[in-house]
C-alpha cells in the first residue's frame, strides 16, 4: 500500500464516520473469530461464549486459517474510501497474510513455551472470568467441564507437529511439564480456585453448583495430568536439545512480532551499541547516587534503602495502585487524553507464581477495567520501588493501559478488529517502552533511584535484542561480553550481568526468550521506531507540533504492524 495519508484526518472524522464495506469485512472476520476462539470473547468481555474454548486441534487451526483466507479474498475487490480504510486494509493484509504463512509452515503445530501457548492460555482465561454471581460460577463450571476437550485438541496438534518434525525444544517441554503439574496438583490452581468458592458477600453457592465445580475442576486437573504424561512420554523424546531456531524461522517470527522485516544482523549490531550507550547512562546516575559507585554498588545501595522497600504482596499491590492512580490523575490533566471510562486501572497480584508482569485490557464496554498483574515467584516477599516505578508506568499509564484503552474507546472511528483484535508486540511493547522514556522527559523520574530503575529496564530490553538475535542465529559474541559464538549458557551469564532481577525472574525470562523467538527484541525495536516517527513529525511540524495531539492521533490508530504505523503517520 502506498496510498496512505497522514492519519491526522482520522480524528476530525470522530463521531461522524460511517462504517464502510472494508469495516464490514473486518467486523465479519471479528465475529467469526469470536466463534472460533470463544476465550477471546471472554478476554474482550463479550457475552455469549462463557463456557467454550477454541478447537486447538489441527482441524481447528485449519478452520481459523480458512477464515483468514476468505477474509483476504473479500478484501481483494474493495477500495478504501478514507484514511481509516487504508490503514485497515494495509493492516489486515499484513497480519492475516503473515498468520497464514506461519500456518502453512507448520510451526503452529509446535506452539509450546513457558509463557504464551495453549498450555497457559487454557488455564489463564479463568483469571478474567467474573466470580460475583451464581451465574458467573455456573459459567466457570461450564468452562472447566470443557478443559479436557481443549487439552485433548492441543495434544493432537502437538502430536501432529512431532510427525512433521515441528517440536519445541526440550527446555520448553520440560518447563511446561512443571507448570502443568502445578496447575493439577492438590492446592494447585484448579483446586484452590474452586474449593471454597463463594459469592462476594460470603454466601455459599447452591450445593448442586458446588458439586459440579468440584467434578469439573477434578476433570480439568486430570486433563492437565494427561498433558504432562503426553509431554513426558511422547513429546520430550522427540524434542530437540538445541534451543536456537536459526535464521529462517527466526525471520518469520520476527515479522510476526514487529509487522516489519528487519535486517537481523544490522539490528543485532544496533542492539550491541544501544546496550553500551545505556550502560554509560547508568554509570553517570550511579555516580549521582554515590560518588565513585559502580552501577552494581548503586543498585545495592538502593536495595538497602528502607524508604524504597516493600514487604509482602499486599504492600506491593497497594503501592502499585497508589502510584498508578496518581499517574492517571496527573497525566490526564495536561499530557494525554484520558476519558472517564479509561481512568479506572486495577493493580492485581496474579493467582500464579510464574514470575511475569503483564497487563490485561478492559472489556469493550469498560465494565471490566484494565488490569496490571504481578505473578510473584514462590518464596519472594520483598520488593523495591526504585526498580518498579517504571514498570507501573510501562504496564499502566502512559503505557499499555493508555494505549489499549484509547483504542478500545475509539468505537466512533475504528471497527472492532482494529480496536480489540489486532495486536502487534513491536507496536504495543514499543509504545510502553517509549512511554517509560517519556515519563523521564516529563519529569516523573527525576529521583536518581527511579531513573536508575528506568535505565535498568531499558538495559534489559537492549540486552534482549543482543541475546535473542545472537543466541537464535548463533552470531559472534561482542568482545565486551566474551568470545566465540552465542550459546544459551553464554547467554544466561550475559543476562545475569545485564538484568538486575531475582534468580526466579531471571530463569523465567531466560526460558521465555529461548522459547518465544523474536518477541523479546520487539520492545526495544518498537521503541526505536516510535521515537523515529515522533522526531520526524516534530521536525516537519516545527512550532506547531503538539505532543498531546500526536500521541492521541497515533494511539487512535490501534495496534498495527510497524510498517503500517510508519505509513499511516508519515506518508502523504
Residue ranges and their predicted role:
Residues 1-572:
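N-terminal maturation segment of proteins
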Amino acid at each position: 500500500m502506498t496510498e496512505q495519508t497522514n492519519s491526522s484526518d482520522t480524528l476530525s472524522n470522530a463521531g461522524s464516520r460511517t462504517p464502510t464495506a472494508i469495516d464490514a469485512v473486518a467486523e465479519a472476520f471479528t465475529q467469526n473469530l469470536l466463534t472460533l476462539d470463544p476465550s477471546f470473547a471472554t478476554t474482550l468481555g463479550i457475552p455469549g461464549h462463557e463456557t467454550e474454548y477454541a478447537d486447538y486441534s489441527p482441524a481447528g487451526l485449519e478452520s481459523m486459517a480458512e477464515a483468514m483466507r476468505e477474509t483476504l479474498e473479500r478484501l481483494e475487490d474493495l477500495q478504501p474510501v478514507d484514511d481509516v480504510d487504508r490503514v485497515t486494509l494495509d493492516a489486515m493484509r499484513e497480519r492475516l497474510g503473515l498468520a497464514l504463512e506461519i500456518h502453512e509452515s507448520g510451526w503452529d503445530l509446535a506452539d509450546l513455551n513457558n509463557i504464551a501457548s495453549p498450555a497457559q492460555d487454557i488455564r489463564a482465561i479463568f483469571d478474567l472470568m467474573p466470580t460475583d454471581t451464581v451465574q458467573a460460577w455456573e459459567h466457570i463450571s461450564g468452562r472447566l467441564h470443557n478443559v479436557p476437550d481443549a487439552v485433548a485438541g492441543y495434544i493432537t496438534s502437538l502430536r501432529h507437529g512431532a510427525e512433521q518434525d515441528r517440536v519445541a525444544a526440550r527446555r520448553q517441554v520440560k518447563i511446561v511439564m512443571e507448570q502443568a503439574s502445578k496447575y493439577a496438583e492438590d492446592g494447585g490452581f484448579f483446586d484452590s480456585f474452586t474449593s471454597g468458592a463463594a459469592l462476594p458477600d460470603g454466601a455459599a453457592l447452591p450445593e448442586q453448583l458446588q458439586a459440579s465445580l468440584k467434578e469439573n475442576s477434578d476433570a480439568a486437573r486430570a486433563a492437565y495430568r494427561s498433558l504432562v504424561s503426553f509431554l513426558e512420554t511422547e513429546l520430550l523424546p522427540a524434542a530437540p536439545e538445541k534451543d536456537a531456531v536459526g535464521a529462517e524461522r527466526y525471520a518469520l517470527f520476527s515479522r510476526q512480532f514487529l509487522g516489519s522485516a528487519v535486517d537481523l544482523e544490522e539490528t543485532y549490531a544496533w542492539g550491541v551499541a544501544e546496550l553500551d550507550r545505556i550502560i554509560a547512562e547508568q554509570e553517570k546516575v550511579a555516580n549521582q547516587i554515590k560518588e565513585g559507585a559502580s552501577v552494581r554498588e548503586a543498585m545495592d545501595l538502593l536495595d538497602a534503602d528502607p524508604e524504597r522497600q516493600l514487604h509482602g504482596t499486599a504492600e506491593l499491590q497497594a503501592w502499585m495502585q497508589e502510584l498508578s492512580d496518581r499517574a492517571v490523575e496527573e497525566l490526564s490533566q495536561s499530557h494525554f487524553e484520558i476519558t472517564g471510562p479509561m481512568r479506572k486501572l486495577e493493580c492485581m497480584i496474579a493467582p500464579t507464581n510464574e514470575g511475569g508482569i503483564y497487563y490485561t485490557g478492559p472489556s469493550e464496554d469498560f465494565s471490566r477495567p484494565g488490569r496490571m498483574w504481578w505473578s510473584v515467584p514462590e518464596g519472594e516477599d520483598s520488593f523495591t520501588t526504585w526498580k518498579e516505578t517504571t514498570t507501573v508506568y510501562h504496564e499502566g499509564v502512559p503505557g499499555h493501559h493508555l494505549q489499549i484503552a484509547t483504542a478500545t474507546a475509539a468505537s466512533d472511528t475504528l471497527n472492532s478488529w482494529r480496536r480489540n483484535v489486532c495486536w502487534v508486540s513491536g507496536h504495543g511493547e514499543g509504545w510502553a517502552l517509549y512511554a517509560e522514556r517519556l515519563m523521564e522527559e516529563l519529569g516523573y523520574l527525576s529521583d536518581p533511584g527511579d531513573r536508575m530503575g528506568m535505565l535498568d529496564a531499558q538495559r534489559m530490553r537492549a540486552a534482549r535484542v543482543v541475546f535473542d538475535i545472537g543466541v537464535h542465529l548463533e552470531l559472534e559474541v561482542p568482545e565486551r561480553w566474551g568470545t566465540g559464538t552465542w550459546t544459551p549458557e553464554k547467554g544466561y551469564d550475559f543476562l545475569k550481568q545485564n538484568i538486575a532481577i531475582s534468580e526466579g525472574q531471571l530463569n523465567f525470562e531466560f526460558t521465555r526468550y529461548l522459547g518465544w523467538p523474536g518477541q523479546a527484541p520487539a520492545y526495544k525495536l518498537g521503541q526505536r521506531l516510535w521515537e523515529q516517527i515522533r522526531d520526524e513529525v516534530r521536525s516537519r511540524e516545527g512550532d506547531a507540533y503538539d505532543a498531546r495531539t500526536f500521541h492521541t492521533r497515533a494511539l487512535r490508530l490501534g495496534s498495527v504492524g510497524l510498517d503500517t504505523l510508519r505509513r499511516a503517520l508519515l506518508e502523504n
